[in-house]
């Protein structure tokens, strides 16, 4: 097994992608391969980190160095100085990512993040959205496993009703009620439909979670399917979404 000493997390969300994050990823991969470091350094395309105004965003672990407004031209400096020599390129860091003593601050100590408690977006910017193993490593599909082995469909619906969870749309309709009505509906065939269409121009709520943590959507749909008696599901999103 290769021992990875550094992870280069590059935002692959819609905003950063429109600012050439794909080219940045390819340039990191090219230069790392040229130096024969591909078994030591892993480049990961992640979902949105949330701070789109600072994009393209690159975070290098284990230091947690938060590089903002990255360009293809700056990749060489980070590879040569940070990844090869172990020296963080502080002048390329986000302005709040260095403290008064000129030390690198953790991401959660930056003002934008320190009061946040991510729930639905907890894995965005943390895992490779296309790698199911990384999702499982962060307790992915654990809830589905519990539902299928320890709970009846009605018990799942009861939990949803008690939770008070509501839809993210304007109506805020209780999710548990939706599942209750769907379960009670008599039909030979039932489906779970995920409406991932952004109703408002310029909105990125649904797109962010689909791009950054698609397995959490699939897991939730599977739980819903079990609760209401469905065996198929569909995700609806617009064709222009670059997922």
Predicted feature locations:
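Feature of Fe-S/electron-transfer and energy-metabolism proteins
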Residues: 1-243
């Amino acid at each position: 097994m290769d021992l990875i000493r550094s992870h280069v997390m590059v935002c692959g969300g819609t905003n950063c992608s429109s600012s050439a994050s794909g080219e940045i990823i390819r340039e990191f991969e090219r230069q790392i391969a040229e130096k024969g470091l591909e078994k030591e350094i892993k480049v990961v395309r992640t979902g949105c980190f949330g701070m789109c105004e600072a994009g393209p965003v690159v975070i290098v672990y284990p230091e947690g160095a938060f590089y903002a407004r990255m360009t293809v031209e700056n990749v060489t400096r980070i590879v040569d100085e940070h990844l090869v020599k172990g020296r963080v390129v502080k002048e390329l860091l986000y302005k709040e990512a260095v403290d008064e003593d000129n030390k690198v601050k953790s991401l959660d100590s930056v003002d934008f993040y320190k009061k946040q408690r991510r729930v639905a977006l907890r894995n965005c910017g943390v895992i490779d959205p296309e790698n199911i193993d990384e999702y499982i490593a962060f307790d992915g599909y654990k809830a589905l496993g519990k539902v299928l082995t320890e709970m009846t469909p009605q018990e799942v619906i009861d939990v949803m009703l008690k939770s008070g969870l509501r839809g993210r749309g304007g109506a805020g309709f209780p999710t548990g009620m939706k599942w209750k009505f769907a379960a009670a509906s008599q039909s030979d065939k039932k489906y779970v439909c995920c409406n991932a269409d952004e109703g408002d121009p310029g909105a990125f709520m649904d797109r962010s979670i689909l791009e950054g943590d698609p397995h959490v959507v699939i897991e939730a749909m599977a739980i819903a399917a079990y609760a209401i008696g469905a065996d198929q599901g569909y995700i609806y999103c617009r064709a222009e979404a670059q997922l």
